[in-house]
Amino acid sequence: MFVYLIQWEEKKMLNFNFLNNMRHWGDGLAKVEHEMKHKHDDFRQALNPNTMEAAIWLVEELKKTLEENYMKEEQYNILVLNSWLGIPLVPLLCENISVGELHLVDIDNEALELSKVFNKHYIAEEYIKVNHWNLDIPFAFDELNQLKVDIVITMGAEQMYPLKDLKTANKHAIFAVQNSNVIEEMYGINCVDSEKALIENAGLKNTYYTGKQKQFYYDWN
């Protein structure tokens, strides 16, 4: 005997309408082709399934938390650490959350220059103020702590030193922090293996949401 019960639950979908933004991607890819050929692989990695899945998951849960626990009528100012090319995270944020100002921080200045092109729609046509900061994050906490932001996001916390000293100028700022356990990679200097370890690593006191997703890490050796 087999009994199967299906229970339906409503799921709010994110807005994936990137078409307005994608018309600038041709310019971005032309810049890669003619000026930064070595960035082809960065573009590919930015849109690989693991990165896309992680970004969508982060924005889904962040949006849900903001709607349920952090009601605010005006727009949000958001700080993104290790923003890289800004895709897919910037379009996901701008299409699904009311963004007033974005601070995108990365040590890779070429990636930031490409981000300005790939995300031009939100800057030039949606009039979202986007600031690109070329900073080495562990040594820039003094500057970053002066920013008055509502949300701090990092999808690659394993690539940075612990964020305990990052406070921002808003003591009520929400932190959305993703990390991984890919310690085999040389850039994984700050990996964790549990949600509890990540909370301690980031110096967080109160949490609205914790979760874990399994992804596949491909070792080609």
What are these regions (language model features)?
Residues 108-110:
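Conserved SAM/SAH-binding beta-strand->alpha-helix loop
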Residues 101-106:
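Conserved SAM-binding motif I beta-strand of class I
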Residues 85-98:
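Conserved SAM-binding loop of SAM-dependent methyltransferases across substrates and taxa
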Residues 73-85:
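Conserved class I S-adenosyl-L-methionine
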